[in-house]
Amino acid sequence: MGNVNILEKRMIKYEVSVKQTAKFIMMLLILSLAYVMPAATTKKIQQVSTVPKKTLTVLLDAGHGADDSGKVGINQVLEKDINLEIAKYVKEFLEKEGINVVMTREDDSPLYQSSDRNKKLADMKKRIQIMVDCDADIAVSIHQNSYTQESVKGPQVFYYKDSVEGKKLAASIQEAFDLVIGDENTRTIKPNGEYYLLVHSPMPLVICECGFLSNWEEAKLLATPTYQKSIAKAIGQGILEYLANEKRL
C-alpha cells in the first residue's frame, strides 16, 4: 500500500507539472503572437503608404506661332516669341516639381497644314486635339495682351464662364501674379464664353494674359528673360497651389 501511495503522489505531481508546462507554453505562444502581429500590421501600413501617386499632367499652350505672330509690341517684340519663352520656363519649373508637362508647340513650326483653307481654325483644332490625346489634368494657354490706351497694364487670367475648376485655377494663378507684380496690379480674373480654347477644352483651361505689349514699360519687361522667368514662376506656383488645394498632389 505504501508503494501505491508513493506512486499515486508521483503521478499527481507529474500531471501538475505537465499542466504547468502546458500553461507556460501557451503563454509563450500568446506573447509571441502579440509581438509578431503588430509588426506585421505595421509592415502592411508602411507598404500601403509607399504606393506611388498618379503622375499629374499639365498641358502648356504657347499661343500663336509660325505665320501668326499674335500681337506686335510697342517695341516691335512679337507675342508668339514671348509666349513660347514663358511656356518653356513654366515647363522647366513644373518638371522640377515632378509634374509631367505636354506642350502644344516647342518651336515656331505651324500646327496647321499648308493645304488648310482656314489656317487659324485648323491651328485651334490641332491644339484641342493635343489636349484630348494627352489627357492632361489641366491646361494653361499663355498669351500677351494689348489695348488702345498705353497706360493699361498688368497680367490677367481668363477662364470659361461655366467652369468651376477653371475659375479656381484662374484665381490661384492670378493671386500668384499679384504677388510678383505687387499691389499695383489691379486686374482680376475674368470669365469668358467665346474664346475657342476655353469653349472646346476637354479639361479645365485658363488663358494667362501675362501683360500688355501696348504698354511701353511692360513690353520692355516682357522681352527680358528675367521678367519672363518671374512670370513663369508665378504661373507655375499658381498651378501647384491649385493642384494642392484640390488634393491632386
Where are the regions that the model predicts?
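Catalytic-site microenvironment of enzymes
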Residues: 1-249
